[in-house]
Amino acid sequence: MIRIKGARENNLKNIDLEVPRNQFVVFTGLSGSGKSSLAFDTIYAEGQRRYMESLSSYARQFLGQMEKPDVDSIEGLSPAISIDQKSTNRNPRSTVGTVTEIYDYFRLLYARVGIPHCPKCGKPISKQTVDQMVDRLMQLEERTRIQLLAPIVRGRKGEHAKVFQNAKKSGYVRVRVDGNVYDLSEDIPMEKNKKHNIEIVVDRLVVKPGIEKRLTDSIETTLNLADGLMMVDVIGGETLNFSQSFSCPDCGISIDEVEPRSFSFNNPFGACPVCHGLGYKMEFDVDLMIPDQKLSIAEGAIQVFGWQSSTDKKSYTRAILDALAREYHFDLETPFKDYPQEVKDVLLYGTGGREVKVYYKGQRGEGVYDVAFEGIIKNVGRRYREASQNMKAEYETFMTITPCDECHGQRLKQESLAVTVADKNIAEMCDMSVGEMVSFLETMELSERQKLIGEQVLKEIKARIGFLNDVGLDYLTLSRATGTLSGGEAQRIRLATQIGSGLVGVAYILDEPSIGLHQRDNDKLIRTLKNLRDLGNTLIVVEHDEDTMLAADYIVDIGPKAGEYGGEVVATGTAKQIMKNKKSITGAYLSGKIKIPVPQVRRKPSGFLKVVGAQENNLKNIDVEIPLGIFTCVTGVSGSGKSSLVNQILYKRLAKELNRAKTKPGLHKDIEGFDQLDKIIAIDQSPIGRTPRSNPATYTGVFDQIRDLFAMTKDAKAKGYNKGRFSFNKKGGRCEACAGDGIIKIEMHFLPDVYVPCEVCHGKRYNRETLEVKYKGKSIYDVLNMTVEEACDFFSNIPSISRKMETLRDVGLGYVRLGQPSTELSGGEAQRIKLAAELSKRSTGKT
């Protein structure tokens, strides 16, 4: 048993609990009842902290520290691993393949059994002999001067003094460092922290009949020095690469030895040289720079930074546009969409070096200038490169992501993409869905040699792909960027990775793994969770899903209500025991005693939106009618295209049309009927703020009105306080000892940082003078400490405040304190606060 005594973290009421080890345990209860406080903030935090304390103090300073949870004791605890939904990697270089490490196994497989092809003609290529190299060099024009180079250092940092000493001892006279030839007797400038390429000059020759013997000897020497590699510097021409490994006899192309790093898009040896392994480029988009092409330039059609002054007749920008209009015979008052393509090309891409006469009158006088116009796109591109980081972020709102022209989104250089296994290169393999890959790996044809070498690697790949398939992610591809995954998908990927790691004796803490998962895939997930338990692990799952609760070995129901009214253990036991427990609301729903009523009469729509020809991601050119004025649910199995339709097409297109947002909608032909709406609002689960200074009162805007009330009291007027006095973000009214935080951080170096209440204000955030001002007997601190439920009664006679409070209560947040830091709110709570903020506004009926 894991024995917990006196857990008091957040809203937990000093609870004692025994959780069975090596079992599948579900923590359930109302939103905000304290499930996460017990599972993550208490059990996981303590398990992680104890593991950290077993490390040396030197190691601990690099790993960061964990605060000791507010609990008397926890016995029988294993090392804990948390699999939550928040820690998704947003790095564009991170993919499903890299986070699961399956891609690392594929890199190894392709390096060991892959068949290289010529990137130019596509023919399989094999190793070159010394004779073939001699023949190739003898084909050069007579009297061509060449240098035979042995590449001995490639892309490595350091001063490499020993390399130069050994070369000198061996009798060599010259080396080429980073493209420059140096004499070994001179001092060679080397930057220690820069990557260098070093080649020894083995021989220098002039191509002419009769040098074959010397050339053969020199080539053999070079190949021995550089492990079968040779570079030939043709003076006045290009450098030729030779290898005893692979070369194309037809095209004369030699490629490097195939290594695992050749297939890494995070390594210069494998990455596409144009996009550096990202697979895409950021480019300025005409549709974002000129969002409304029905407008003329004079009316402000050009919206991109640096060009808004085109509406000002006295600006230099307008003078250039006037000059172009005279030269190319168009009118700046004409709508942009009506210009011929030639005029659009001149405006966007420039005059191609042709100069136009610009008449400009500025502060220093007037003049005539001959200007070769570079084009709006090139101009803003230059401004973007020269801009500060903040301005770059602004410019990027006018840019879109386009696939790289060189690698077509496959991230790798052409030589790496030319290596195949079972007639597929590594990018094509990773573009298959997990479900397709399971079948392909079972049926793909390999030679006996390939099977022998790749047996162990393939075994690992098949096992890990199988785990992904088992958690209901059969629709994902290994090339999918992790930044595009939902919280539930990212969590299930980490779950599959943990099963692949094969750890035993661990306490896994999971946060609603079934979220976003279709019922069809739920059985797969539950089977996977049981497999993880059967390995010898303890599973603690925070969950509301009925199937998961019924499948669990043990359930802990926390409640009875949320927030201040929760934090107690209501019931424990098996699903059957919970159903029989009269105190458990969860049990009443599981047993069917309480049900959510299905409406007998449905509302009728007030109109329809029609999406025509939706083709984003996996959508098959579909037309969809969405009724307006009613509650509509878009559903389907995981990966069916729901988010592509709603988030990528519908939201982005309507945001662009109605909110003038700079968004690029997903691929579709048209949306009909949006003239019936006046705005669109997206409410997701992202935090309402990133710091403890953000809270429900500040987010909903109600704190401004509360501060106005305090500023209007007699005490405040007598002391000359304005509303700014009641802000904990400004000097004046806040406690300066803690800068309005209410807590002080004490750094303990090798121990966790300790947060203690401020000794001056005792955690109240404000100074004494500010706290003396009372409204209806309450200070500003007292108001921030109220729950939404209490605030509804307190502000019942102030409609503008009570309306917002009642809306927060109606979405089930009556237990949340007005000043509760946003960092303490769950994703669901943050989403409901956003929803309440919108619902409390006066409705136009067209949102």
Q: Where are the regions a protein language model picked out?
A:
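Conserved phosphate-binding elements of NTP-dependent enzyme cores
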Residues: M1-T847
